[in-house]
A protein has these predicted regions:
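Activation segment
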Residues: 241-243, 271-276
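Protein kinase catalytic-loop region centered on the HRD/HxD motif
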Residues: 203-216
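Pre-DFG segment of protein kinase catalytic domains
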Residues: 235-238
Length: 413
């Protein structure tokens, strides 16, 4: 009597008893489906991300390769563009009285901008087929090189048939002018200024060879390509012949040498082997010229005594101080002068591997240490005991430079 009747049980509307076997399987199926769907979604998402990243990397690599190709093809940040009428007005239409000098690629004129700024304008020769290549090479390097001992390029002008490069103006002209033009000028070049010039050129070479983003070989370093500011600080100029190397590259071979005899190393002049040691040879010649006040002669030049040979003979005899520029009188520190002469002789040794690097030279110039190696016989030695350079051999390179003017037409680039 306590249990409800079947009719009353139906009225209570109890839920039907679960069917345990089939219900459990259904829930598992739903759960498995959800998991598999989520897993598939995650897999697809990972695949899509991987594809996207791969494409991004590929694009970046292609852009990097394109950038490398552009860099190797000498692209550069475009310099300021000057108009031809502006530069004509600044230089008095390239008036002869504004002419500062002349080189293998053209003439240099002094100019004055409307704001009063003094400038130097190099007017490249229109007859030279190499003019545009030299201009492009110089602009490419100017966009990537910045140092207090390098001349700064301000801009360029390519209008009509003119190819003009605008530089900062340096009032003390070139080292060549101060050393060799007149006795009066040399008297104003005391030892302190000479030592400052030697040290500044060395620091400029250190930057070009080891510290800049490019490894640059100048290839035509000489006194006329060293300009001096109002404080007599030297600035290396004229990078028309310069060659940029990869950071891991130390030397190259050219078909024809291009530069100025008397400043070209023997391995470069005769074999076309160019390296940082070629520049160091040129630097050594300049150092000896600054110390002695005398110009080095070209090898094979008739009736000419090589400055390098004379300094070497005096050095071996212990009388090197006799080679000091007479215009200095006795107003110079003898030890420092002999130290510079020693460094110059180390740099002009015949074998490139014996010449010091720019970093070594900078260290030697700033150090009072005398523990330096003994220089061997210089290249192009023409002394009584050394094998003289024959005139016929030297003449094979005479077409490289004439009367100290750089020639580059013989070397295709």
């Amino acid at each position: 009597s306590i249990l409800p009747s079947p009719s009353s049980r139906a009225a209570l509307n109890y839920p039907p008893a679960p069917v345990h076997g089939k219900g459990r399987q259904s829930k598992r199926a739903v759960l498995a489906g959800a998991i598999s769907t989520g897993t598939l979604f995650l897999v697809l998402l990972v695949v899509l991300v991987c594809v996207y990243m791969k494409r991004t990397r590929t694009g970046a690599n292609e852009r990097a390769r394109d950038g490398a190709r552009e860099d190797s093809s000498n692209t550069y940040v475009s310099p300021e563009q000057f108009t031809l009428p502006l530069l004509r007005a600044a230089t008095g239409n390239f008036a002869p009285e504004n002419k500062l000098g002349e080189g293998g690629f053209g003439q240099v004129f002094k100019g004055k901008m409307p704001n009063g700024q003094a400038i130097a304008v190099k007017r490249l020769s229109q007859s030279s087929s190499q003019g545009f290549h030299e201009l492009k090479n110089e602009l490419v390097l100017a966009a990537k090189l910045r140092h207090r001992n390098l001349v700064q390029i301000l801009g360029v002008c390519l209008e009509e048939k003119e190819k003009l490069i605008v530089y900062e103006y340096l009032p003390n002209r070139s080292l060549d002018t101060l050393l060799f033009d007149s006795e009066r000028r040399r008297r104003g070049l005391d030892w302190r200024k000479r030592h400052t010039i030697i040290c500044g050129i060395a620091r400029g070479l250190l930057y070009l060879h080891e510290e800049s983003q490019l490894r640059v070989i100048h290839r035509d370093l000489k006194p006329s390509n060293v300009l001096l500011d109002e404080h007599m600080n030297p600035k290396i100029s004229d990078f028309g012949l310069a060659r940029a190397f990869r950071p891991d590259q130390s030397r190259d071979v050219t078909k024809r040498a291009a530069g100025t005899l008397g400043y070209m190393s023997p391995e470069y002049a005769y074999c076309g082997h160019v390296s940082v040691k070629s520049d160091m040879y040129s630097f050594g010649v300049i150092v000896l010229e600054v110390v002695t006040g005398r110009r080095n002669s070209s090898p094979g030049q008739d009736n000419a005594n090589s400055l390098l040979s004379e300094v070497w003979e005096k050095w071996r005899a212990g009388t090197a101080a006799e080679m000091a520029d007479a215009s200095l009188g006795d107003q110079y520190p003898r030890a420092q002068m002999l130290s510079c002469m020693h460094i110059g002789l180390l740099c002009v040794q015949k074998k490139p591997e014996l010449r010091p690097d720019a970093s070594e030279v900078v260290l030697m110039l700033s150090s009072q240490s005398r523990s330096r190696r003994t220089p061997s016989r210089p290249a192009f030695y023409a002394g009584s005991t050394g094998g003289a350079v024959t005139a016929s051999r030297a003449r094979r390179s005479e077409n490289v430079s004439k009367n100290g003017v750089t020639m580059s037409e013989l070397e295709p680039r």
